[in-house]
Amino acid sequence: MGDRIVRPLVAGFVALAFVIQAFSGSVYAAAAPPVDNSIYAELLTKYVVNGHVNYAGFKRDEARLDQYLKVLEQVDPERLQREEQFAFYINAYNAWTIKLILTGYPGVKSIKDLGSLLQSPWKKEFVRINGKTLTLDDIEHTILRPRFKDPRVHFAIVCASKSCPPLISEPYLGAVLDAQLNRSTRDFLNTPANYRLDRNTFWVSSIFKWFAEDFNKDVVGFYLKFAQGELKEKLQAGRDRIDVTYLDYDWSLNGV
């Protein structure tokens, strides 16, 4: 008798728990919608062409960029879904890097000009997010790399230099982030300026040297996931004999 009473009660509590969980989940989701990147999308469309940045245009529209940075500043990234959070920090890195360049533009010839003997530009505390002041290094090395553990991020964040991956002319978005990261990685790795294969010597970007651990110390293996055409064929054919070395890095500004 008692058992017949208890079972429906338990079932009722379980059902109620599912309803509460679903309701609370919907409330949480409603409280953390995707970030509004419309201003950034507008600016990128106007001032980024084939990966080259029109800093003069951004300078004229700096107030508009500041509006977008204010949007980022007011976001609580911890309340975003994982892919939205990943995209948020990529966009934040790139947008704040543009802002950094504008602090010295038009006189700046390299992002390194904005540093000093005692402080690199990547260690400047000027990035404002959710009541905190961060550095570009904080975003890259304390958040993006350790939290998301995705080496493709190295081809999405842009350090305003010619040897960096090109800035794409659209924001990164959580809903299509995987496809965007694949495209950015594939485009960079297959651009002839970013590699040279001469017999058994393979010159690649210094990114692979600086962040070897992120690529499991297997440059060729990573390349084979994204290489196309003749490059892929040659890498596959000579994989066991290839020696990897690194191209010089051009830190001059990635402007038009």
Regions found by a protein language model. Name each.
Residues 1-7:
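N-terminal secretory signal peptides that target proteins for export/translocation
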Residues 6, 22-24, 209:
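Low-complexity, intrinsically disordered tandem-repeat tracts enriched in small/polar residues
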Residues 11-22:
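Bacterial N-terminal signal peptides
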Residues 24-31:
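Boundary at the C-terminal end of the N-terminal hydrophobic targeting segment
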Residues 32-256:
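Interaction/scaffold regions that mediate signaling and macromolecular assembly across diverse proteins
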